[in-house]
């Protein structure tokens, strides 16, 4: 069952933390989260799941930043959230989707007990100008039935910034089959 907006408001400070909280962004069954002023892009041409990838930080100026098609941008919400005894989920706003901007490629599902900022996996199908502080996605909450343990992984928990993929920490690393270069940079 999904919580109503009024139920979200009533659980603030106990099972739900949203900081900062603006009552004007509360919807009938969700809350609008806003875009922070920075993005990350990957520098590698090919991303290897078994290796950490270099990133480049971009600032979104007040006059906006144009996102190019066929480029993955990692952003984050400006709001810090905590969820206890509920399952948090985020979904892109329909007004954003109608501009051809995907806000999260796959990871809209959160874990009970998650604390931190939501990393957004943004992908534009055509050039789109974005702005810091724009309401970019909605968070909503499901009740959980049955016994559970709160999220305890240290991989993304308590993050304070945009989080690139940390999948490499879960995978065994194999040696590179290529010969080393005979010169140094």
Where does each model-flagged region fall?
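DUTPase catalytic domain/fold
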Residues: 1-185
């Amino acid at each position: 069952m999904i919580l109503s907006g009024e139920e979200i408001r009533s659980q603030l400070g106990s099972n739900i933390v949203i900081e900062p909280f603006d009552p004007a962004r509360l919807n009938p069954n969700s809350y609008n989260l806003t875009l922070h002023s920075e993005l990350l892009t990957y520098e590698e041409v090919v991303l290897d799941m078994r290796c950490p990838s270099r990133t480049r930080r971009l600032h979104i100026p007040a006059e906006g930043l144009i996102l190019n098609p066929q480029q993955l941008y990692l952003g984050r919400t400006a709001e810090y959230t905590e969820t206890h005894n509920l399952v948090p989920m985020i979904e892109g706003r329909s007004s954003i989707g109608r501009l051809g901007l995907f806000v999260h490629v796959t990871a809209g599902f959160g874990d009970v007990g998650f604390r931190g900022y939501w990393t957004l996996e943004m992908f534009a199908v055509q050039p789109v100008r974005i702005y810091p502080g724009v309401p970019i996605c909605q968070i909503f909450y499901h009740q959980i039935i049955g016994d559970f343990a709160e999220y305890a992984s240290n991989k993304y928990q308590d993050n304070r910034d945009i989080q690139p993929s940390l999948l490499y920490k879960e995978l065994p690393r194999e040696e590179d089959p290529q010969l080393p270069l005979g010169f140094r940079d």
